[in-house]
């Protein structure tokens, strides 16, 4: 009885703490990119680092290689412009690695919690193992979708650090990263839709199996498969988190 009362008294505190952490994470995730890129905009404009070059794509932020510094006006501070160029690349690569690791940690954590929840019921039937398999695939697909979206841009940044001169490979990566960097939401929706389709198939198979089973087996199967419907709402948080990143 004491354990139940203490659990009920601490539950609102835990919920309030979780809400505050989520609000702080939302605010910081909005402010940190602005704070990190403020030196690039401020110092870049005062030092005249960004302007229209002879090649149209060189005016894009973070895509002006050191070789383009020769086209800057005499009043431009080349040392500041070069420092801002490498600073922008470092921020981009660091954000990519941090976002990828965060997505993987959140999804693996959700996968672990769900496995503990299923195993706590004391029964692992065919449906439970099928759902666990879908969750495992989902944990792999979201990081793969994130890497497919931002991988070409990361490869382009790394190649430009080693070979600043523009080549045909650079132009191909320019076009590829322009297409993939804007398709993260589309790929996330594809992974989410595929997962929901698999859940729907499991429900259809459960209904077909129920038609060929005895009343006792039907009641047992309904009892042990109650967690299937609650899983869809439980896994919506990793989906929205991955889309935000």
From Swiss-Prot:
Lineage top rank: taxon: Eukaryota
Name of the gene this protein is made from: TMEM116
Keyword vocabulary terms for this entry: Membrane, Transmembrane, Transmembrane helix
A biological process term (GO) from this entry: signal transduction
Main location: membrane
UniProt membrane topology term: Multi-pass membrane protein
TM regions (residue ranges): 24-44, 88-108, 141-161, 173-195
Subcellular location: Membrane
Protein name in the entry: Transmembrane protein 116
Gene Ontology CC: membrane
